[in-house]
């Protein structure tokens, strides 16, 4: 006994050294060395390297691992990041232009923004285990509908600029006059919005006319107009008569509106607008140097089937109870592909949830009080400036004034900087001041000092200041639903948030094995700095000398991503994978234009591609030509050669995913690239499956010219229940000059090409997560993570292949990081469909794998490297038990109609009801596996009726009793 203890103590002493103990790879990667050996043995392999040799073609393997800094540790990386963060300077930013500081209620920050129960969930395709955030998003839609005065709203877009661009495209797609090609944009719109709209218009052949809305001569050549409300200089304008002029020539009117201003001002709907767009940033979201923030999009009911983005609707479940779901999905890219209303996939769910909760917490009166207080402070400031001889350009305002400072401008701006205050500088010498929720009397006194205004008794003036003219004042009510009236104490709010959280399955519950989605660990250390004020309180248009910390992060991350991808340049601006695709295709388009080859407009896309691929290609102005796949799931080389040769004079690009969407490393990928290059085309690689490449191969090694990366997949940014995402693009050297730029900032790319996102660096505050992940893993850790992701997928494929045929494998019989299981035979043998298997998995405590993509009637599984062998086995056991249930249906032990699969998922209410009319016991419904009793996740609703929901579309809040 003593000898054993002595040996153990000696082993411990030998194991511990001066090296830090808080290394990260062992925390991130799920299986330990013993589990790895066990899985390898089940595959008949002796090492991870042998697995990689068999799964990954030798011709594309990297000769050496990426040259990255040595892996840091969790404690040290936060120390290092604090030092970097200290190089950002937190000024009071009154720049405005669509970005305003706000006060984030602690109950929302702590319990949603910083809560993995909210931020690790996936897009709510599986409605039954997503009812919490679906309700929060329904609240968001109701909030937008009420404030804009329109009839229907989506559940968020990426930002205000892209929302405006989407509005332009909607107007263009539904125009009745086919020759109408002009879109009017008011010169009073925010500059970044104009920039994004112009970028979107160019590939589509739309002519943007920027000018004064009062003097522009509209005619039938115009299909739409875009207006800012209040204007970028702060002026409040009643656009009613102009909108009528637009309608008279058949043009669709869009108003980009400030949500907080709409609590006091006449709504866009009251002015006759067809569409309202904007940002919900000032409803509880940090500035974050530009994002992420939730854009919004509202329109008239008649345009609902042309609307972009996710739409939450009310349906009913199998028990007749209300059930929320994603509605009208036939509009979207994953179904309509190049005919979709938008290429948007990931939106900004987490941010929309936060904004909706901000409105729930404050209620209509609270929001109105916030807006009124801001307006009163603005009025006091304006009056004081006018009394001191300054001219205010805008005679009407909500929170923003623009001052004619003349020769005093330079001194004023210098004094502002000395007070650590940012003001908006116009090229014509004017100065803008946009006040916000954080402003108090002391801030106003500091502004008086900056403008050398005589100090005024602010408290005395406050009560009588700020009367908005009746002609602009809002007369209609808003946020009348009880959800906005009921949760105004922290106790109530906390319990409401927790109630909704408990209805959603996230990574805090179990593995989410969605193929092509990479639901890996979002480590706590990676998430910490997102809410640090040094990163969160920075305005996106703050002077560069105040953002040196961000610059360090961007430069290092871009360098690391170049090393990982084998590319020469990276842009971090795209704030979603879909935007990355679009930006990458625009780079290809601009490259061809620079070579005087504007006729190159054909984009070849395999039939197995993600739906965003053809949607993005169409948006970039390309003609989509589909390439077939062979029986092994690979790109059909003969068909590719035929199509490439047929279109060689007009070939712009090929879009491919690697490993393929069929879950295999295609052996011929380099030949595929060569076929396209030899005919003048460029190769775009969809980076959705990059988690199987890092450290083993790279897009550059394979021969791609451009690739987007999903930082919310491969590089650990959480999915947020449907966003935020970040989709930077890497490009080869010849495409670097064609990366996106930005009208307001000297971008790192040094070019003048238009922006694809409203903020220069997109969702800047969350790229920190990926920076930390790479720094903690190092090259060796990242490469090992890739190996384990491939091991885990092959282990699952091996365990399940006898019950569910694995549809595609590589040359040596192995899959990549995901596998596709064929469920189609069970439809014929037992009338069991893929949806039945997916819903039954909920009863076992799992989110379903990806359903019916890329092959209908199949399940695509991606376990990632973060899941341990215990969790993989638990999932496999659930799938095998479901297979046994299918066999029980086949042999008659279970009824073909009334069985646990057809009736799944089973709620607690169903299984505790006194009435049970089914032909199988309650216990089998409720506790189908041993672990169910230890930790049971109960779906809040039974199976939701998709058809009923689309036929009876309701997209605003549920009745009162639902909130009791």
Curated annotation (Swiss-Prot):
<dbReference type="GO" id="GO:0005960">
    <property type="term" value="C:glycine cleavage complex"/>
</dbReference>
<dbReference type="GO" id="GO:0016594">
    <property type="term" value="F:glycine binding"/>
</dbReference>
<dbReference type="Pfam" id="PF02347">
    <property type="entry name" value="GDC-P"/>
</dbReference>
<feature type="region of interest" description="Disordered">
    <location>
        <begin position="1"/>
        <end position="25"/>
    </location>
</feature>
<dbReference type="InterPro" id="IPR049316">
    <property type="entry name" value="GDC-P_C"/>
</dbReference>
<keyword id="KW-0560">Oxidoreductase</keyword>
<keyword id="KW-0663">Pyridoxal phosphate</keyword>
<dbReference type="InterPro" id="IPR049315">
    <property type="entry name" value="GDC-P_N"/>
</dbReference>
<protein>
    <recommendedName>
        <fullName>Glycine dehydrogenase (decarboxylating)</fullName>
        <ecNumber>1.4.4.2</ecNumber>
    </recommendedName>
</protein>
<comment type="similarity">
    <text>Belongs to the GcvP family.</text>
</comment>
<dbReference type="InterPro" id="IPR003437">
    <property type="entry name" value="GcvP"/>
</dbReference>
<dbReference type="InterPro" id="IPR020581">
    <property type="entry name" value="GDC_P"/>
</dbReference>
<comment type="function">
    <text>The glycine cleavage system catalyzes the degradation of glycine. The P protein binds the alpha-amino group of glycine through its pyridoxal phosphate cofactor; CO(2) is released and the remaining methylamine moiety is then transferred to the lipoamide cofactor of the H protein.</text>
</comment>
<feature type="modified residue" description="N6-(pyridoxal phosphate)lysine">
    <location>
        <position position="713"/>
    </location>
</feature>
<dbReference type="GO" id="GO:0030170">
    <property type="term" value="F:pyridoxal phosphate binding"/>
</dbReference>
<dbReference type="Pfam" id="PF21478">
    <property type="entry name" value="GcvP2_C"/>
</dbReference>
<dbReference type="InterPro" id="IPR015421">
    <property type="entry name" value="PyrdxlP-dep_Trfase_major"/>
</dbReference>
<dbReference type="InterPro" id="IPR015424">
    <property type="entry name" value="PyrdxlP-dep_Trfase"/>
</dbReference>
<comment type="subunit">
    <text>The glycine cleavage system is composed of four proteins: P, T, L and H.</text>
</comment>
<feature type="compositionally biased region" description="Polar residues">
    <location>
        <begin position="1"/>
        <end position="10"/>
    </location>
</feature>
<dbReference type="GO" id="GO:0004375">
    <property type="term" value="F:glycine dehydrogenase (decarboxylating) activity"/>
</dbReference>
<dbReference type="GO" id="GO:0019464">
    <property type="term" value="P:glycine decarboxylation via glycine cleavage system"/>
</dbReference>
<dbReference type="InterPro" id="IPR015422">
    <property type="entry name" value="PyrdxlP-dep_Trfase_small"/>
</dbReference>
<dbReference type="GO" id="GO:0005829">
    <property type="term" value="C:cytosol"/>
</dbReference>
């Amino acid at each position: 006994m003593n000898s054993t203890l002595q040996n153990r103590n000696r082993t411990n002493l030998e194991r511990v050294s001066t090296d830090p103990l808080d290394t990260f790879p062992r925390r991130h990667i799920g299986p330990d060395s013993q589990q790895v050996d066990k899985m390898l043995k089940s595959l008949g392999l002796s090492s991870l390297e042998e697995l990689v040799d068999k799964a990954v073609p030798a011709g594309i393997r990297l000769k050496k691992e990426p040259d990255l800094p040595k892996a840091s540790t969790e404690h040290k990386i936060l120390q290092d990041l604090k030092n970097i963060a200290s190089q950002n300077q937190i000024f009071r930013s009154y720049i405005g232009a669509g970005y305003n500081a706000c006060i984030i209620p602690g109950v929302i920050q702590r319990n949603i923004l910083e809560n993995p129960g909210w931020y690790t969930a996936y897009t709510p395709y599986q409605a039954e285990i997503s009812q919490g955030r679906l309700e929060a998003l329904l609240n968001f839609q109701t909030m937008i509908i009420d404030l804009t005065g329109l009839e229907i709203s989506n559940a968020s877009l990426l930002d205000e600029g892209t929302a405006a661009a989407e509005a332009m495209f909607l107007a263009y797609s539904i125009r009745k006059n086919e020759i109408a090609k002009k879109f009017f944009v008011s010169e009073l719109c925010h500059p970044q919005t104009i920039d994004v709209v112009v970028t979107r218009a160019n590939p589509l052949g739309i002519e943007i006319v920027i000018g004064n809305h009062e003097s522009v001569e509209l005619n039938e050549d115009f299909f739409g107009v875009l207006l800012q409300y209040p204007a970028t200089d702060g002026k409040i304008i009643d656009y009613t008569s102009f909108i009528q002029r637009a309608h008279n020539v058949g043009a669709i009117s869009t108003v980009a509106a400030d949500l907080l201003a709409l609590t006091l001002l006449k709504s866009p709907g009251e002015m006759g607008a067809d569409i309202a767009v904007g940002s919900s940033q000032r409803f509880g979201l940090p500035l974050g140097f530009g994002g992420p923030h939730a854009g919004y999009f509202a329109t008239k009911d008649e345009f609902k089937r042309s609307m972009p983005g996710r739409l939450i609707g009310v349906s009913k479940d199998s028990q007749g109870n209300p059930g929320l779901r994603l509605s009208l999905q036939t509009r979207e890219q994953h179904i309509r592909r190049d005919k979709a209303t938008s290429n948007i996939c990931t939106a900004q769910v987490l941010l929309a949830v936060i904004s909706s909760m901000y409105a729930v917490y404050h209620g209509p009166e609270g929001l109105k009080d916030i807006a009124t207080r801001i307006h009163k402070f603005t009025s006091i400031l304006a009056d004081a400036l006018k009394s001191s001889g300054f001219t205010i350009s805008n005679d009407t305002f909500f929170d923003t004034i623009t001052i004619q400072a003349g020769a005093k401008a330079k001194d004023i701006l210098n004094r502002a900087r000395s007070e650590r205050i940012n003001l908006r500088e116009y090229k014509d010498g004017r100065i803008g001041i946009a006040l916000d929720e954080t402003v108090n009397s002391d801030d106003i006194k500091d502004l008086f000092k900056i403008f050398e205004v005589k100090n005024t008794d602010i408290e005395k003036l406050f009560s009588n200041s700020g009367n908005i003219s009746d002609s602009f004042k809002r007369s209609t009510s808003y946020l009348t639903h009880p959800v906005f009236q009921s949760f105004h104490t922290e106790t109530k709010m906390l319990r409401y948030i927790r109630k909704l959280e408990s209805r959603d399955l996230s990574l805090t519950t179990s593995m989410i094995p969605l193929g092509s989605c990479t639901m890996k660990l979002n480590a706590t250390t990676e998430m910490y700095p997102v809410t640090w004020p040094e990163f969160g309180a920075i305005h996106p248009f703050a002077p560069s000398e105040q953002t040196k910390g961000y610059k360090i992060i961007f430069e290092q991350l871009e360098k690391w991503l170049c090393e990982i991808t084998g590319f020469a340049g990276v842009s971090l601006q795209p704030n979603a994978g879909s935007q990355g695709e679009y930006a990458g295709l625009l780079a290809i388009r601009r490259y061809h234009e620079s070579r005087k080859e504007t006729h190159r407009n054909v984009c070849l896309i395999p039939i197995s591609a993600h739906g965003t691929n053809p949607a993005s290609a169409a948006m970039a102005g390309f003609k989509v030509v589909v390439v077939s796949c062979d029986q092994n799931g690979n790109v059909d080389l003969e068909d590719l050669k035929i199509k490439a040769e047929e279109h060689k004079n007009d070939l712009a690009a090929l879009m491919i995913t690697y490993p393929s969407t069929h879950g295999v490393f295609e052996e011929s990928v380099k030949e595929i690239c060569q076929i396209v290059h030899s005919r003048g085309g460029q190769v775009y690689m969809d980076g959705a499956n990059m988690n199987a490449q890092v450290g083993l191969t790279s897009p550059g090694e394979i021969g791609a010219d451009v690739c987007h990366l999903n930082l919310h997949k491969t590089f650990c940014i959480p999915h947020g229940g449907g966003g935020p995402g970040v989709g930077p693009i890497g490009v080869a050297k010849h495409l670097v000059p064609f990366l996106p730029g930005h009208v307001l900032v000297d971008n790192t790319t040094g070019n003048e090409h238009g922006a694809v996102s409203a903020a220069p660096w997109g969702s800047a505050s969350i790229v920190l997560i990926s920076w930390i992940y790479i720094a903690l893993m190092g090259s060796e850790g990242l490469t090992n993570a890739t190996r384990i992701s491939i091991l885990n997928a092959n282990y699952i494929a091996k365990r399940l292949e006898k019950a569910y045929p694995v549809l595609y494998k590589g040359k040596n019989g192995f899959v990549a990081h995901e596998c596709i299981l064929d469920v189609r035979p069970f439809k014929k043998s037992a009338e069991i469909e893929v949806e039945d298997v997916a819903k039954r998995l909920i009863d076992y405590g799992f989110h379903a794998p990806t359903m019916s993509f890329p092959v209908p009637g199949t399940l695509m599984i991606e376990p990632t490297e973060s899941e341990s062998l215990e969790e993989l086995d638990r999932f496999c056991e659930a799938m095998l038990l479901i297979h046994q249930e299918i066999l029980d249906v086949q042999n008659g032990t279970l009824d073909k109609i009334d069985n646990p699969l057809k009736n799944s998922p089973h709620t607690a209410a169903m299984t505790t009801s006194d009435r049970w009319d089914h032909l199988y016991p309650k216990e089998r419904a409720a506790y189908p596996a041993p672990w169910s009793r230890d930790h049971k996740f109960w779906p809040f609703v039974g199976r939701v009726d998709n058809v009923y929901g689309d036929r009876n579309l309701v997209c605003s809040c549920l009745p009162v009793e639902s909130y009791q």
